[in-house]
Each structure stands twice: as structure tokens, then as C-alpha cells.
Swiss-Prot record:
Feature: DNA-binding region: 356-415
Example of a GO biological process term: regulation of DNA-binding transcription factor activity
Protein name (database record): POU domain, class 4, transcription factor 1
Protein's organism: Homo sapiens
Biased composition, class Basic residues, residue ranges: 99-108
Amino acid sequence: MMSMNSKQPHFAMHPTLPEHKYPSLHSSSEAIRRACLPTPPLQSNLFASLDETLLARAEALAAVDIAVSQGKSHPFKPDATYHTMNSVPCTSTSTVPLAHHHHHHHHHQALEPGDLLDHISSPSLALMAGAGGAGAAAGGGGAHDGPGGGGGPGGGGGPGGGPGGGGGGGPGGGGGGPGGGLLGGSAHPHPHMHSLGHLSHPAAAAAMNMPSGLPHPGLVAAAAHHGAAAAAAAAAAGQVAAASAAAAVVGAAGLASICDSDTDPRELEAFAERFKQRRIKLGVTQADVGSALANLKIPGVGSLSQSTICRFESLTLSHNNMIALKPILQAWLEEAEGAQREKMNKPELFNGGEKKRKRTSIAAPEKRSLEAYFAVQPRPSSEKIAAIAEKLDLKKNVVRVWFCNQRQKQKRMKFSATY
């Protein structure tokens, strides 16, 4: 390992510490070197009764105790512990293998309790902890068999290579190299934890770079929110459309009912008969009705001829013309009846104006009733004429004149039959 470290370039971010600040390093390194070297023949001769392996272990423990007692006044371990201070910074993973031929170069070994306390209480490492991430980023990751990372504080790990090398150096140092992962090599006190560092890197990468097939939770929430709003907006629009459609259906139904009542032939026939009777009762001729329509001031409606009113009453107009003329004649009839009521309420105002008596026209039903009464009694009394007039809603004078005219008619018919 000494030769391997001497061939590698140094990427230290900070200047290396001079060796003259550590005067007690040589004694501790000498003690550890004695522990690592084979037992001399002289010692085997002096302690022939003891096993050589037990002696070697005892000397190793003594060397470790010396190193611990001397290392309490120094924040860093001796040069011999790390083989060289210029190549690798102090980390919790780079300790001297006591049995060098039994350990692979990339295995991590735990620190002794005294060394761990020294590293934790070191003020230099406390200052370097803040720059751990920057050191790891600047140190970079080594290749598979190269050094683990840069030599700066908080940079890459020790000289261990391979896929698991290149761990983060120092507390807070990031992962270095392709084998470091997010959990650096110094953060793995156990060899199994070192493999977890490699597993954590793709997991974090997958968390950082989400696959395109899985949408972001925020985007999913936003899409759900807009979808609900959209759904809500679509439901409100559907309710408005349904309400408007229902109103349109109701309006169409009402209009259809009105149109049906207006366009029903039986309704038109009943109105035409009613209009004729009320017109006769008012004493107005068909020509007067046609000329009076211009006084209604209805847009697009002027005076009509007498033949048009006659055809309306006799139902000989076309169906569309009957439908168009019905509201006009109804308006005139209401106005004429209103004027008639006013005239009856104030008869003195209209007596001077009536000079010519209008010819009375009797409707067919009333005419048939009068003919039936005439067949029974051609000469009724005055009381009988008054009762007939009241029953048929006609004037008494009209009924009297009709009976008189009917007798004259029958006389002419008899005279023509005789001669």
C-alpha cells in the first residue's frame, strides 16, 4: 500500500500539515512498527515458555495503549498510521491493518475508541464539516481501482478502490465516484452498510428524476382540481341548459296550446257565429265593421270590405286568413260593446244623433225559434211577444215586427198559390 499511495497524484484542497508539529509521531510509529514486525529471535529465546503469537499480541496491545496515550494531545494520528499524511486526509475508514496480509485493500475497519473520540473532538474536523459537501463535489469520484476522491477536507474517501470505493470524506461529505453513492464510505461503519450506499444512489436518482410515466403529485393534484372544476362547471352548464330547455319546452307547450286554440276549426267556427250574433245585436252592418277596423290603429291593418267580413262569418275564407282576422275582429267587438255600454248608461247624449234606424238581422237559431212560435200562434199577444223577446234575448219591437212580417209573407205565399 505504501507503493500504491506513492504512485498516485495528490488532489488536496488544503496544504498538508508539516510534520514538525507532531514531535511524538515517531515514537508511536516505532511502537506500531514493532508490533507489526515478526518477533526477534532474542525475544523468543528470553520467553521460550510463551507462545510467539501471544507475545506478538501483547506487544501489539502495548503499542496501541502507547499510541492512544500519546494521541490524546494531538488531533491527528501518526504518520505511520496513515502511511503518508500528504496523500490521504484523516478519515474514520483508513486505519492501519495490523495483519496486512489478511485484509483486502478496500475493506473498511472501525477505529479504536480513543481514535474515534479524537476525530469527533477535533476542532479542525469541526471546521471542515461545513465544507464537506463542497469538498466532495470538488474531489469528484475516482475510477474503479483508483483513489476514492480528492484529498481536500470533506472530499473523497481513502485509497480504497473498486465499485465500493470513492466514499464521501469527512462529516457532511457527499458521495464521491461511481461507487460512493449518496452515503459516503466514511458513513458505513459496517461492510453491509457500504452496499446500502450503492442502493441509495439509484433510489435517490429515481426520486430526483421521476420517470415520465409517473406524473408529479403536484401536477396530479392540479389536474384533479381543474378536472373537478371542469366537472363542476360542466354540471352547472348542464343544469342551466336543462333549465333553459325546460323553459323552452314549457313556452313551446304554452304557445302550442294557444296556437292550437286559435287554429282549431271548431273554435274558429264558434267565434264566427258569436261575432255575427253580437254584431247584429249591436245593430252594425258588415260594411260598418269593415270601415271601423281602420279606427283601431292596429299596425298593418286598414279598412276591409263588406265581402271579407261576410266571408269570415260564413267560414268561406281560407284557414290562414281566418286565423289572422280573428284577433282583429275580436278587438273591434270588445271596443264596440264597450261603446254600447256607455251609450246605454248615458242615453241622452246619443238620442239626437240617431236619425236612421238600422235594419235588424236575426240569426238562424233565433229565426228557427220564432218560426216555431209562429206555427203555434201566428198572432201572439203583447205579453207573449215580450216573453219570447226576453227568452231569445231580442228586443220586443224586433219580435213584434218579425211576427208582422211573417204574417205578410204567409199571405203572399197563399195568394201566389191560389192564382
